[in-house]
Each structure stands twice: as structure tokens, then as C-alpha cells.
Amino acid sequence: MSLLNKPKSEMTPEELQKREEEEFNTGPLSVLTQSVKNNTQVLINCRNNKKLLGRVKAFDRHCNMVLENVKEMWTEVPKSGKGKKKSKPVNKDRYISKMFLRGDSVIVVLRNPLIAGK
């Protein structure tokens, strides 16, 4: 019987480990697996409406991640005084050398479009 069809409750710890590895290599988490193996950048949209562009060093099934060389990007609308027109949004960013990202704040993870196209 294939590991994908067998109920998890009937699996040995070794079979569970093998199945998780298989899912990480073929399932949706394969984007993160490839990023770790090839040291490529990913773009992560977060729930705080910020984007993170960086390299994934490690991750788990909850999408918790250790990231390096991260550029955090967001937009801010400056406060306008009385009688002034609406201000235009301003793009902001900052560099973070190492960070831990909790998985529940992740919306979507994309391969770096500049490299993925090659």
C-alpha cells in the first residue's frame, strides 16, 4: 500500500517521516524545500500587509521559517494636514539580516519571479 493512501494512525514513525519528506518534495511546501536546497529567494506576503524578499534557511510544516538577507517592503500613506489634498502612498523598505517568521502570519510564498523565469 502506498504511503499516501495509508491512514496516518496506522503508520510507524519511520513511515510518517518518509511521508512528510515526500510531501515536502512534491506538495505545496516544495517551493520552500527548493529555496532551502538552491539558496534562492522567495517573496512572502504577510498578514500585516508587508512583503518579505529573502532566502529560506529552514522551515516546518506550519510555515514557520528562518530567513536571511530579508528585504521587508510596505507602503505608508503620510498624514495630511487640514485642507491639504490626499497624500500619495510612499514605498518603504528595510533590511533584516536574520529573522524567524511565524507561519500563521504567512499568506502566500512565491519563487523569486526574476530567477524562476530562467
From Swiss-Prot:
Residues 1-31 are annotated as: Disordered. Pfam families: LSM. It is found in: Cytoplasm, Cytosol; Nucleus. Residues 7-21 have a biased composition (Basic and acidic residues). Keywords: Acetylation, Cytoplasm, Isopeptide bond, mRNA processing, mRNA splicing, Nucleus, Phosphoprotein, Ribonucleoprotein, Spliceosome, Ubl conjugation. The modification Phosphoserine is found at residue 9. Its main location: cytoplasm. The modification Phosphothreonine is found at residue 12. One of its GO terms (molecular function) is RNA binding. There is a cross-link at residues 6, 8 (Glycyl lysine isopeptide (Lys-Gly) (interchain with G-Cter in SUMO2)). Core component of the spliceosomal U1, U2, U4 and U5 small nuclear ribonucleoproteins (snRNPs), the building blocks of the spliceosome. Most spliceosomal snRNPs contain a common set of Sm proteins, SNRPB, SNRPD1, SNRPD2, SNRPD3, SNRPE, SNRPF and SNRPG that assemble in a heptameric protein ring on the Sm site of the small nuclear RNA to form the core snRNP. Component of the U1 snRNP. The U1 snRNP is composed of the U1 snRNA and the 7 core Sm proteins SNRPB, SNRPD1, SNRPD2, SNRPD3, SNRPE, SNRPF and SNRPG, and at least three U1 snRNP-specific proteins SNRNP70/U1-70K, SNRPA/U1-A and SNRPC/U1-C. This is Small nuclear ribonucleoprotein Sm D2. It comes from Homo sapiens (Human).
